[in-house]
Amino acid sequence: MSDERITVVNKWDGPTVKNGLDEVVKKILNDKVGWTEQHNLMNLRLLISFIGVAFSAFACGYDFYAPFPKSKIVLLVCSVSYFICMGVLQLFQWYVEKDCFYEANEVDGKQTRKWAWSSEIKAHDDKYVLSAEFKKEGRSGQGKIIKSIGAYIDNDGEIMIPLVQREVDDLWARLIRSEQ
């Protein structure tokens, strides 16, 4: 993994660059550190979406068997419930997920450290903000790196994995040292 490069990204497209860098960070953490990614946030998002779609499907099915005048109340309740579920989903993404793209548990002897990695690139800005947070038995720590995407992407739009890996290793080591 020392001199690997990943697929070319359009360096002028912020969301594409963010997603590409996030994938590189995931790969580094899974390969080097050996963590297993947890998908709890994604599973909850899928559950909320499924409940909303189930309301919609029930409304369609009920309207098929009992046409409109009879199904008015059911259609109303299901429609309102669907939009409530979508509102809950949006609030979940804003306040619980908070741009988190990677969660993992690190087992260190008898104790388990829960890690959450997130990132962001603001619109019309070249700064990539990589944040890491861990929680372990009442203790926690967090850190972040703010760098221009130009530090990780060459002129051809290729993400340089060794440079990203150095930053991820540095952030991880800083957080481990700060805990002790």
UniProtKB/Swiss-Prot annotation:
The keyword Transmembrane helix applies. GO terms for cellular component: signal peptidase complex. The chain crosses the membrane at residues 46-66, 73-93. Keywords: Endoplasmic reticulum, Membrane, Transmembrane, Transmembrane helix. It is a multi-pass membrane protein. InterPro entries: Spc2/SPCS2 (IPR009582). It is found in: Endoplasmic reticulum membrane. One of its GO terms (biological process) is signal peptide processing. Residues 1-45, 94-180 are cytoplasmic. Residues 67-72 are lumenal. The keyword Plastid does not apply. Component of the signal peptidase complex (SPC) composed of a catalytic subunit sec-11 and three accessory subunits spcs-1, spcs-2 and spcs-3. The complex induces a local thinning of the ER membrane which is used to measure the length of the signal peptide (SP) h-region of protein substrates. This ensures the selectivity of the complex towards h-regions shorter than 18-20 amino acids. Component of the signal peptidase complex (SPC) which catalyzes the cleavage of N-terminal signal sequences from nascent proteins as they are translocated into the lumen of the endoplasmic reticulum. Enhances the enzymatic activity of SPC and facilitates the interactions between different components of the translocation site. Belongs to the SPCS2 family. This is Signal peptidase complex subunit 2. It comes from Caenorhabditis briggsae.
